[in-house]
Amino acid sequence: YPLLLGAAGGRDADAHPLAARIERVVLFGRPTLTRTVNALLARPDVATALHAPEPAPWFEPGRRRETPVETLEELAAFAGQGEPGWLAAWQHASMRAQAAVEDALVTTDAGDRLSPQTVAHVSAAMVRGPLVLGSSSVIRDVDLTWRPPSAPDAEVYANRGLAGIDGTVSTAAGVALARGRRTVALLGDLTALHEAGGLLVGPTETEPDLDLVVVNDDGGAIFASLEHGAVAEAPGMAEPVERLFGTPHGVDLAALAAAYGVPHTRVTDRVDLVRALSDPVRGRRLLEVRCDRADRPRVAAALAAAVRATFPPTCPVPD
């Protein structure tokens, strides 16, 4: 849906024709992940409501424009009756967009390395139990590429505090222990390094069944897609932006995993990743996938272009 909405939440040339017809939006949870969704919520021609059966600690009346609704009856009254064919049109657009994304991911992987978006798509698609998502770029990659799982008991967890990076390794271990099921954690390298101490399991503690899939692009990728990326293009600014925002680290993740007694595997292609995540092993593993930060904007642009190419000349929007 973020790709269907376009950059301006449905009010730009990149948006699917359906997006401009949106009249009401119901918000579930805090919308901090996607700028396109925030742009949609800010559209003056769109009425918005927040479904809040219990008080939301982040929502202060008067500071956001959504109207709080508590009951399903209030929600139904706000939503009203959709036009015939409206839901089917969105479902059709979504299926076409999903197919376009998956086809584009296959064609955009660069030789002997996977793109970060492909790692996110494959890892999430393999979920048969709990999935823990790291913050920053990783969770946004899943947001763009994930096909909802067929497993009815799939669960997704994420730390969404100030930045969400704190304690993610320990969160994943806690989820695995609490749920009693093999858990997959998809993390960026900085998220993994920020709490490397979470890999420590004392001799009297229970080891979780946990796969840590680490997208290692040697630094922080999120800033290149924000305003900082434009700053880097100015004369003399590329090096300081890379040092202060890219923060390359050069850490040997295999050596780090060995120090904590965690088996390490380097994954180089899609087949290896699928095979590794299908292997019913016990205990913990660190699956390292080395990526290039330069691939991220290239692949993101290719995904957006692929979805735009699926827009029919005339969209089947109900009159």
Predicted segment positions?
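Generic structural signal for well-ordered, non-membrane alpha-helical segments
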Residues: 15, 19, 30-34, 83, ...
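Active-site diphosphate/adenylate-binding microenvironment
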Residues: 91-179
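Glycine-rich, charge-decorated loop segments at or immediately adjacent to ligand/cofactor-binding or catalytic sites
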Residues: 1-4, 56-68, 221-231
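Structural motif
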Residues: 26-31, 51-54, 133-137, 187-188, ...
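Terminal amphipathic helices with adjacent charged low-complexity linkers/tails
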Residues: 48-88
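Glycine-rich, anion-gripping cofactor-binding loops and their flanking helix/strand elements
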Residues: 1-60, 148-181, 193-200, 245, ...
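Thiamine diphosphate
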Residues: 141, 146-319
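Flexible, charged surface loops at secondary-structure boundaries
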Residues: 17-23, 41-43, 123-128, 150, ...
